[in-house]
Amino acid sequence: MSHLKLDTLHVQRSPRGSRRSSRSSGRSSACSSGSISPVPIIPIISISHDGDESESESEIETEPARLFQRRMSIKCTNNLAAIIKEGFLLKHTWSFQRWRRRYFPLKRNMLFYAKDEKCDVFDDIDLSDLCYFECGIKNVNHSFQIITPTRSLVLCAESRREMEDWLGSLKTATAPQRPRGDSFLIEQHDILSNHHHWYATSHARPTYCNVCRDALSGVTSHGLSCEVCKCKVHKRCAAKSIANCKWTTLASVGKDIIEQADGSIIMPHQWMEGNLPVSSMCAVCKKTCGSVLRLQDWRCLWCRATVHVACRPQMAVACPIGPAKLSVVPPTSVHSISTDDAWDVASPKGNFSPLLVFVNSKSGDNQGVKFLRRFKQLLNPAQVFDLISTGPSLGLRLFRHFEMFRILVCSGDGSVGWVLSEIDRFNMHKQCQVAVMPLGTGNDLARVLGWGSSCDDDTHLPQILERYESASTKMLDRWSIMVFEKAIPVPKTPKMSISTEQEAMLTGMVTSANHHLRFIVETSDTQTLISSTRNLCDTVDDLVCRISEHHKDDEQLAVKCEILRQKLNMLLDALQEEEMGAHSGDDLIATIRSLIARSIPVTPGSSAYLLNPNISIEKTEKDQINTKERRNSRSLRSSEKEALQCRANSVKRAIYNVVEHSEPGRPKRYQRKLSITPFEALKLPTTASGESSPCTSPLPIIPPINIISPTMETSRLTCISPLPDTRRDSVDENFFNSINLPAPRQFADSRRSSGVPEVIQEIEEGANGETMYRRCRMSLTGGANIDDAGNRLSPCSDGGENTPTERKVDFLRVPIHTGEPIVDPLCDYRPHEVFERTYYMTREMDKDKEKDKENDKTVEIDKEKDNCVAKEDSIPAERLVHTCNLQVPGVVVTPNTQNVYSSASITIIDTDAQTTTEQSSSDDLGGEASDILSAISNEECSVASEIFDKQDAGQTVGDIIQNMDASNFTHIDSPETSDETEAMPGESIMDDISSVLGHDITYALQDNTLTDDTTTLCSEHAGPPKPPRKKSLSALSRTQAHPRRRNSSPPRIARLARMDSDDNPQQFGFENIVFEIDNRCDDQKMREPPRYCSLAQFVEGNDIARQSFKQLMLEQQQRDGDNDTEYPEQQQTPTNKGPNSLATTSEDELSAQTAIKIEIHDIDATVRNINSSMKPNTILTTSTSPTKKSGHGQDISVVVRPPTPLRGDSIKPTASLMPVSSGGAMAVSMNCSGMLGVRAMNASEIRRHSSHAPGLAVREFDKDKDRRHSGFNPNQLTLDPEHARFLSSSPAASRRISCGSLFKKKNKKIATKRSYGLFSVRFFVVAEPDFRLATLALIRPLIPLPNEALPNLQSLKGSKSSLFMGSTLFGFDHLASAEKDKDEKGGKDKDKTPTEETNRKLPIINPLVRLPNWPNLANGGGFISKCLLANADTLCAAVSPLMDPDETLLAGYHEKCVMNNYFGIGIDAKISLDFHNKREEHPEKCRSRARNYMWYGVLGSKQLLQKTCKNLEQRVQLECDGQRIPLPELQGIVILNIPSFMGGTNFWGSSTKKDDIFLPPSFDDRVLEVVAVFGSVQMAASRLINLQHHRIAQCQSVQINILGDEEIPIQVDGEAWLQPPGMIRILHKNRVQMLCRNRSLELSLKSWQEKQRQHSISIQRDASSTASEHANSTDEVISERECYVLLNFIEAVSSLVKWVKFLIISHPALQHDLYEVACRASEALESIHPQGKLLEGPSLRTKLVEVIDSSRQLYDDACTLLRDRGHSLILREDLETKLSAALANMEMELKKCSVQKCIDGKLRAYFNVLAPNEESDGRRKSRPFWVRLRSGSTAGQQAFKPPLTNTREAASNWSVNEVVTWLETMQLSEYVDSFLKNDIRGKELLTLGRRDLKDLGVVKVGHVKRILQAIKDLSEN
């Protein structure tokens, strides 16, 4: 290297830099860039990972030295182009295997690097001619090398994902410019470009470069190899290689395309030269090809055939593709990529089932990389995708146009779930079948499907592909994990947390800053404001300074600190502007100005550990707004207040941004909490007491005490389980206290506050047990008070304070006073039409209410009561009209009647509190009034049902709906019942009715005139009814006098007087129609039959998908008394005096009871009422049974028909459906829909059970959800096309209340008899698809339809989704139980008895639940709770909304993930989560399957000591199919879909008992198995023994309620995370086709293939013999091989003639004819070899015909003679032996001879060289010849043949065919032809040596060893 001139370097750098540059220039890969003179140096290329090459390539290779250039760039000149990727990588320094960390920015066609990003000078590399590849096969250290014509760099990334990102970025940087630059086109270009994919590797034999044809350097032939086509090149030659890699599409085939005459394209061979595998055989000449001395011969990349250069022209043109032809997508079939990013495919001829392969390259210690490359070599490279780099979407998009294809996922269970999720996204379930190759750790799904637990060897991949081709298909159930998370209000410190001193100090700083921000926004005291402002500035200053100490070089952190300083200054500016008006000139302004002038250091700070963001986010939005109202004492304008609050929010977010950026590696669960919504950034706390702030406010400060107090231990939450309160002992009182999900305006219910700050304050009830609700109304914007004229009202000046002892507070009335301009915080979520409509509706309703109030005779009583309330809140009652309030009916809870709380328009009934002698299992119920009210407000509190008054005749439907008051018709989950929502004024449940029933039915319903307080049902021992009846009449007359009034409730004081009367037995009023309150003495209860109740069904956690409304239509039952009706004709709504009683049955028949007796008291009066109003009064399907009543018209029996989903356009006006007659039975029967409503009703009362939680029903529409529809009001949930499709799509939609009942008991005595007649019971079912029939069923339930319109009940057998399946109220389960079980279980239980079928009805609960060690939840139901669902369908069918499980179960939830294998919560998820964290921290420790199992064992043992998930049963609740399951002490719950858990454990256990109540577990039965986990010891023991005592249930849906405020670990298919409190539902999502291994089919196919191969071998033998015959038939010359057979034939004939003649001579008594035959045979034999010489030419074959005929005759006659006379012959022993051998040889030789007639008509003889298997001498000697002759039959001969023995003696007698069979048994059939050509018999086989085998073509070392060992075994035997 003396020729190098170092003085030619002219780099203007420091001497150190110059010396480093000089040294670097001597080493090729270390050269950089810059303006530097080119220096010729010797390239030194090495890869440190392989460690194989210690010398440079130039020392071995003879090519001249290359010129390497080094260039440098200045930083300022490199800022012109955009940076594609930048980051730090490790760069190899080529000295002592060292690595240096360097900063690399990548731009288009240029790569730069320097020590760090702040360097001014960068080395640059031109990437215009780039070659990059991975280093090594498995590439453990994630290194890759880039080679250009001038540079070579080895770089190392931190992870394989980062390495893939860099390689992808290099593709992007070097790819040509495209108009569309998305990732799909980049990957598409990579697929279609035919570029090689290099990786560095070594070789075991000499290998040659395909570019320069020279040998690769080094002893191990180290170089680059293409992972697809195995092209070998030098590293220096990689950039010069042409793009001739394996074809992918038709375009890549190019000029090699072969097109036939018919236009079809033939798949040609794709040849690669040289480097053939060992022992390659030419496909043409069958000789060895390839060489280790040079690059010669060819191999096809598709069919793997090898040929010589000279034989290649003789090769067939069409390529057979190879053994994997069924799975390969030929490149000639893929024509192009269409506009939808999918292939345009032309299916090839023949069988075609393409295979799409996804490989996780990280799986199995990077074993996936080997499989990825192997698959690309076997298949089309465009069929194989790496999940790490491209994901599943690219491959699925490309394969979208295939009709059917298979998917092979080579990874663990997590990647399988990823692929299945993408299949869901593309909706490709029907066209793909998924198989799994186990490369992960657990591989549970692969175990269940039969593919084994692991697959580590890629050498047998072709055989594995054949297994997947013969696989069978099964359906895998997939389950949606739906979660409903609740916010955690107060964060709790982890139990075992170790905090550093610095972390605690920074946490205190952030907490202090948050408190000061609250004081600044909240306080009205000047001194407090000054102090808080100064402390805030000091705290922020200290925080920034401390963080900047450890992060001095972080520019981004410095920017965030600067933003924090600016936002703090903006806050001070806003505070100065705010206080300028009221406090001008005081010291506050001076202090603020001084603080603004101060400068906060800009230096970025160090990081603290992640602080919990919920320190100041624990309050709800309503507290924020209420606190803002209490701050009105400073008389600030609204805009200034909002500006100040926004500035405070900005400062708070800036503080969190600084802290978050200072520690980028914090857990994701905390980063999720840092996402602060705009209305949740600063939730200001309110004062907990009644004391006001130092600065007095004109408004009282209402204490924000929730009805659900966090301090009350006995309170109960609103649970979602339909179970009594006593079953929920572990419920957290804060559950769902802060749920508030914002919804977009397209989905938001306008009655709910989806993100709107709530203003309803909740007051804890005092000791008097009485709460009063004031009627209020809130403005439409939620922030301004508007009077009747639309002007903004001024704040009230009256002030007052509330003391904690004054409990009687109007807590629903909170006036809101704001400034001029107000920006609605939800303007983006609410349509503009809402504001206009609600504003005018509010103003009109205010005017109407003022007129009504003036005419109200009891207004003085109301004022008196209002004044009582005003004493507490200091607000005059007369100002209530002018205050923005919320319309809420009053409620007075009286402690006189236990569990019943009534008022003028609402009755609250505690359904769970036990009033009977049956005590609850909970000790917390009863006693304090606050406890009762706490339970009432959250569980039992229901609002008055809506009442329709009679409208004016001239009103239209729009007027009716627009003028409907919210107090008349109330949503079940409306603001009046929810402590979390507020209502928009003017809206009512009419919107929901319109959305469900349509405007026609809504208009028809309004004809009913229903009163509010008519007592219709009470105790049988009724008290004096006159006083309440008079009040009822007065209320009714007042209602008729004011038809415009929507609220028909009577005066409150009258109602209170009636409700407070202790001697009034009818105080329950209308409530008893729906509920029977058991509040009487025991003897009275024993005398009376039980009354059964109904319940308005809530969907768990939701509001029944927008369709919840409460309008009960009640039926009258026949009574024995005479006081049945009191006013039948005086008014349109007759009032019934006596109470109705439901038909009573025994308790066993209770669940099946459906009939209600409806009696028509006066037919004529009823008909007159019907004629006066043609509209139906209700939408109701009812049921009665035939009864008889004296003195009245004929009784009518009505059958309850279940509700059917309706389309709005299918509902017809009732007047047009049926003519009406003025009298007669037919007219009554045809118009009896009017009878159903011709009676007075009390205030509708619906019990709100504890299972009905308020929720948010968020409806997600289709892609056209944003499109406007004609006549669509955005504020009304009307029947738009989405709703219509929703109402009619699902056949499972129903209004049945008992769908989720826990009290379903099967009653097999249900009568299904039909009776016919005009007024007889007619029981029929309305078919779902028939909407016209459904309309008739709902609107006219008593119309006698023709028999042909009645569907057959037997048709329910085939309908799984029928409305009646699963409900015992209609008793249809027994019709289809067997068929249903057969359909769902695949017929696996078809042999079960009916009793067993009944016991196996899902859910199947473990009987161990009833044992004493399990908690008892079955005794806490109570009488009322059991009665609620008895006749729920019958009573509530009219008002029960259409509940579609497909819709309502998902409302308010979001899909977290999809479960394929199993779901775990508790200890198993904790172990998986710990392992996941360990793998993320130390991936090098978790690279092998065995090591991962070890880690699982260690972590499981850790949980054995720590018991982190102890007492999990107190933190979760479990429900299976809606039934609450009691839980013992456990640490986890596992829900299984497949019988394999966490690495092959059968956690459910195998069923061995015949009387097992559970179904056999399967993954295709739509059934889940629920298992309890008691500890890690049980999990370990379940791997060894069969455990079953931990089984819980089998069900079809699971719900888990997570209580408390702590997160619980959860895992799905091995992927774990921490789940916050809330609800989790596991529902069936769909099914996917999975490929299962079919071993029986594999065996059958293998045997069939073996037979086919044997048959092909025999055909080849025949063909070869026939070919030889035809080849010799032209010249009639006997070949050498035939001559050898001829000599044996002559020897056999001569021997037989000799011994037959000797036999005749020895026994003269034998026939002499045989001697003559022998003589003729001898003469014929002499004729073919006259004078000892064989004839030549065609005459020989002609003469041989005569010899064969005579020899066959001699053989036959000799055999016949010996068979006939053999028993009497006495032969010498030697003669016997010789004669037997002669006959046997003659028989064998005759089989080789054949006589054929030629074209010229002459007969010629031919010899078959490949004769059939012959019997060896050893077998012949075992039995004398004549004994075999005496057997007389061939069957006998075959029966006595001994088996072939592998002894040396037997082997020496083997023929060629037996040797061939021996080879085939050793699976060496490729050498059969060679052994046949060389005529290797048994004797020759035993003497074969290694050299002989080589001459026979056996060159593989393994095959040679196997053959030699087998020969040795034969010789030894």
UniProtKB/Swiss-Prot annotation:
The Gene Ontology biological process terms listed for this entry are: glycerolipid metabolic process; phospholipase C-activating G protein-coupled receptor signaling pathway
Q: Show which residues constitute the signal peptide.
A: none
Per UniProt, residues of the DAGKc domain are 350-486
Domain (PH): give its ranges: 82-175
The record's listing under SMART domains reads: C1, DAGKa, DAGKc, PH, SAM
Which residues fall in a compositionally biased region of kind Polar residues? 1128-1145
Could you name the domain of life of the organism this protein comes from?
A: Eukaryota
- Supply the PROSITE patterns for this chain: DAGK, PH_DOMAIN, SAM_DOMAIN, ZF_DAG_PE_1, ZF_DAG_PE_2
Gene3D superfamilies assigned to the protein according to its UniProt record, in alphabetical order: 2.60.200.40, 3.30.60.20, Pleckstrin-homology domain (PH domain)/Phosphotyrosine-binding domain (PTB), Probable inorganic polyphosphate/atp-NAD kinase, domain 1, Transcription Factor, Ets-1
Q: Describe the function of this protein.
A: Phosphorylates diacylglycerol (DAG) to generate phosphatidic acid (PA).
User: Which protein is depicted?
Assistant: Diacylglycerol kinase eta
Q: Which organism is it from?
A: Drosophila yakuba (Fruit fly)
Q: What is the lineage of its organism?
A: Eukaryota, Metazoa, Ecdysozoa, Arthropoda, Hexapoda
